[in-house]
């Protein structure tokens, strides 16, 4: 991750997860994202749930993550 502005750690972590999802050559699993992002399991799953709820990421039936429809529309 890059420089963190005080009070924005959650936002920065969410951006890092979105970047990791977008950068993978194949849709990453949660295990892939744990390695790529260096977050704890509870933190990663909380972020993924939030991103899914906002339509910024989506989970496939195979358990992989893709950019969500709202993210693609930006």
Descriptions of predicted regions:
Residues 1-74:
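N-terminal helix-turn-helix
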């Amino acid at each position: 991750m890059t420089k963190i502005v005080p009070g924005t750690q959650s936002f920065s972590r969410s951006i890092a997860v979105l970047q990791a999802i977008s950068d993978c050559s194949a849709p990453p699993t949660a295990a892939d994202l744990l390695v790529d992002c260096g977050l704890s399991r509870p933190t990663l799953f909380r972020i993924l749930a939030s991103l899914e709820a906002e339509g910024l990421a989506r989970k496939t039936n195979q358990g992989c993550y893709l950019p969500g429809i709202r993210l693609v529309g930006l």
